[in-house]
Curated annotation (Swiss-Prot):
Role description: Sigma factors are initiation factors that promote the attachment of RNA polymerase to specific initiation sites and are then released. Sigma-S contributes to the protection against external stress, thus playing a role in cellular fitness and survival.
Name of the protein: RNA polymerase sigma factor SigS
Keywords on record: DNA-binding, Sigma factor, Transcription, Transcription regulation
Name of the gene: sigS
MF terms (GO), sorted A to Z: DNA binding; sigma factor activity
A Gene Ontology biological process term: DNA-templated transcription initiation
Family: Belongs to the sigma-70 factor family.
InterPro entries: RNA_pol_sigma-70_dom, RNA_pol_sigma70_r2, RNA_pol_sigma_r2, Sig_transdc_resp-reg_C-effctor, WH-like_DNA-bd_sf
Pfam families given in the database record: Sigma70_r2
DNA-binding region: 126-145
Length: 156
């Protein structure tokens, strides 16, 4: 499928996501980044998959936008920490509670479990994770169960 067709049918997803997160200040920049990502996703989409193109694009673009927000916050934190200017250090630093919890969870997971959780949070389906990690679907299900068990045990 040509990207022009994909764009004409699905460009409203980008506008919806930007409106959903109340993006107004850097609207054009985020729009361009999401448009580039949409092109990349249109290249890797497999029509034979069970997921429709629109839901595939929406899910992946949504998580990509969240990743962009996280990168932007990390960049601000690095600038704040590296610059010893009194005006910068007087400003309060806000931590994303979600990121802090993920860091706590990652501490007690092994490498495969961390990779599974990272891919799962990025929106990949179990069969896609199995392909990426080169493991069987049953092994992926065991890893998922192990992660759930560890999370429940450590975060009661």
């Amino acid at each position: 499928m040509k990207f022009n067709d994909v764009y004409n049918k699905h460009h409203k997803i980008i506008h919806h996501l930007l409106k959903k997160y109340n993006i107004s200040y850097n609207y054009d920049e985020y729009y361009q980044l999401l448009l580039i990502k949409m092109w990349q996703l249109s290249q890797i989409y497999k029509p034979s998959s069970k997921q429709s193109l629109s839901s595939f694009l929406f899910t992946r673009l949504n998580f990509y936008l969240i990743d962009l927000f996280r990168q932007q916050n990390q960049l601000k934190d690095v600038i704040l920490c590296e610059n010893n200017s009194p005006t910068l250090t007087e400003q309060p630093t806000y931590f994303n509670e979600h990121d802090l919890r993920l860091q706590d969870i990652f501490k007690f997971l092994n490498h495969r479990e961390r990779l599974w959780l990272k891919l799962y949070l990025e929106g990949y389906k179990q069969f896609e994770i199995a392909e990426i990690m080169s493991l069987s679907l049953s092994t992926i299900k065991l890893i998922k169960t192990s992660v759930k068990r560890k999370c429940q045990h450590n975060f009661k």
